[in-house]
């Protein structure tokens, strides 16, 4: 059901896609849609005011759509080709058309041979170039969402800004010189960023706001483990972010992502740091939910019960595996995005 507090996505297909139908948003969120016997699936996104969603029809097709809190977007297609049969209801039509037509022009490899000052100058020109379509459509887009226009400007800016993270690796290769980033490089990194609470729904912004601290903190002392990386990121953000809401959100993003990836077994220092510096009740609740989900499956805890059906329709549950070894057959898949 539609709710003013979340974003709801409904999908109806004539035939369930053979390679699955997945939605992704942000960097860490990729959800496979679970269709019922009638070919219907539904998913709700909470705690997001606005979001860019990518629809993945297996590995063959992708489509980006935009949604805001309170939206109920209904999609339908034949289950084989989104391009030929996709119908959408509940989307903002002008924004949907813009996202269908916008193409991002990136710096060429040879551009990385420029010194950092000239490279940043070129990046800023690229940002303006890539915002031209948006600028030309701003009146029509603003009628549908004033929030989208500003958000899209920032999405383009931070998308191009990701090239700054590649510069230390690409510059010596393209310029055919030895190169160690100096103060000029790190100053440009910092200058590209702005503390903006509204941009936290952008994966590009999140990446830069969390990875730039990694670059800065590893300048003198190498960071060797994911745990060291998370701690250094949180330390830098806590000491250098002025906007308290932005700070606490970034700390939550880092802590949540680390716990999701690595669990809670070796997170005592991170957990204490997080709880000391984050006071927002909603953010604490998000983190606690992630923490508790891992605590439930940590070593020594009873295995959660489940029910599953094999290819012969025989039902299994946890008790059927008591005292037995279980072979897990995993398919390592990668996101095509």
Which residues does each predicted region cover?
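N-proximal helix/coil linker or "cap" segments that precede and/or mark the start of modular domains
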Residues: 245-310, 319-321
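A non-transmembrane, solvent-exposed segment enriched in polar/low-complexity residues
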Residues: 3-151, 164-166, 173
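Short coil/turn connectors between adjacent alpha-helices in alpha-solenoid helical repeat scaffolds
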Residues: 119-125, 166-178, 216-225, 257-265
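Extended amphipathic alpha-helical segments with heptad-repeat/coiled-coil character used for oligomerization
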Residues: 153-216
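Alpha-helical repeat scaffolds
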Residues: 171-192, 226-237, 264-276, 288, ...
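Structural signature of alpha-solenoid helical repeat junctions
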Residues: 145-155, 246, 283
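Long, charge-rich alpha-helical interaction segments
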Residues: 199-259
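Conserved redox-active cysteine motifs that mediate thiol-disulfide chemistry
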Residues: 322-323, 327-337
